[in-house]
């Protein structure tokens, strides 16, 4: 049997310059995050807001369930969409709901959409060293009754938008929203206010298109429509393969 020196020696090779693997401590890696797929989207109108998500919960090429909507009703005027690691989504929404109950008992009123967004920012920032693996989008009505959408990064930075997509198919949905809702970089186009009917048609169309291309998005589309009358839900079937 050849020695290691004989095996790796060759003309012109200086073994003194070769990297050597030294014995070291055994390292155990902790990887708590799993991406469970799914896509969320929110659009704000003049007097309404829409928060939508698909219902597929998957891991790799396995589908855990086909009925796991990612839209969570927080108040009569606010809905949050969460996508990413499903365990963190559930934990985060339970924390938010507990904070909202405490606020209502203390102040005898529901928290506003803007205040919920600010609260979520502090919750996410408090976990900045071990962040929740969640894409968060809040949609609802502000204090003036106008539609509002707030998008977040994993550690709490947030901003108010008119529309936003997040999750596995966000790279496909966001350009469509930029074009059809935001009219970004378009010339000689009249910026017509978005009606609820047109927004609903657009949400359905973009999710149908996303389900054709993204394996982590599909099964069904759950749409939450927030108006001054309250929140109503609508479900649309998507492809299931």
Curated annotation (Swiss-Prot):
Q: Which residues carry this modification: Phosphotyrosine?
A: 150
Q: Per the UniProt entry, what are the Gene Ontology biological process annotations, in alphabetical order?
A: proteasome-mediated ubiquitin-dependent protein catabolic process; proteolysis involved in protein catabolic process
Q: Which GO terms describe its cellular component?
A: cytoplasm; cytosol; extracellular exosome; extracellular region; ficolin-1-rich granule lumen; nucleoplasm; nucleus; proteasome complex
- What UniProt keywords are attached to this protein's entry? Acetylation, Cytoplasm, Deafness, Glycoprotein, Host-virus interaction, Intellectual disability, Nucleus, Phosphoprotein, Proteasome
Q: What does this protein do?
A: Non-catalytic component of the 20S core proteasome complex involved in the proteolytic degradation of most intracellular proteins. This complex plays numerous essential roles within the cell by associating with different regulatory particles. Associated with two 19S regulatory particles, forms the 26S proteasome and thus participates in the ATP-dependent degradation of ubiquitinated proteins.
How does this chain assemble?
Answer: The 26S proteasome consists of a 20S proteasome core and two 19S regulatory subunits. The 20S proteasome core is a barrel-shaped complex made of 28 subunits that are arranged in four stacked rings. The two outer rings are each formed by seven alpha subunits, and the two inner rings are formed by seven beta subunits. The proteolytic activity is exerted by three beta-subunits PSMB5, PSMB6 and PSMB7. Interacts with SERPINB2. Interacts with RFPL4A.
Q: What is this protein called?
A: Proteasome subunit beta type-1
